[in-house]
């Protein structure tokens, strides 16, 4: 399966005008891992566009979503939220 990095800016989160709980529930349902406050890893058999379109339905039209596919040996990080190393070991990005 491909590993995707999903980043978002939830513009209306601070205003309290949108309920983002369904977004977080969907990420958890898919076994995604939160690496930073607004950054998740998810493993899926989809294209980058399909992943973005899927998660777009859980946010407002003015929220921002960025999806990119990780490739083996083509990423690096520091001070990620606990469990990131384990998640990547169990869901290694493809070459």
Curated annotation (Swiss-Prot):
Give its E.C. classification number.
Answer: 3.1.-.-
The top EC class, named as a word, is hydrolase
Where would one find coiled-coil regions in this protein?
Answer: none
GO terms for biological process, alphabetical: defense response to virus; maintenance of CRISPR repeat elements
Q: What's one GO MF term for it?
A: metal ion binding
Keyword list, A-Z: Antiviral defense, Endonuclease, Hydrolase, Magnesium, Metal-binding, Nuclease
Tell me the cofactors it needs.
Answer: Mg(2+)
- Tell me the first and last residues of the signal peptide: none
Which InterPro entries does this chain map to?
CRISPR_associated_Cas2, Virulence_VapD/CRISPR_Cas2
* UniProt-listed SUPFAM superfamilies: TTP0101/SSO1404-like (SSF143430)
Provide the binding site for Mg(2+).
9
By sequence similarity, the record places it as follows:
Belongs to the CRISPR-associated endoribonuclease Cas2 protein family.
| Subunit annotation | Homodimer, forms a heterotetramer with a Cas1 homodimer.
Task performed by this protein: CRISPR (clustered regularly interspaced short palindromic repeat), is an adaptive immune system that provides protection against mobile genetic elements (viruses, transposable elements and conjugative plasmids). CRISPR clusters contain sequences complementary to antecedent mobile elements and target invading nucleic acids. CRISPR clusters are transcribed and processed into CRISPR RNA (crRNA). Functions as a ssRNA-specific endoribonuclease. Involved in the integration of spacer DNA into the CRISPR cassette.
What name does UniProt use for this protein?
Answer: CRISPR-associated endoribonuclease Cas2
Taxonomic source organism: Methylorubrum extorquens (strain CM4 / NCIMB 13688) (Methylobacterium extorquens)
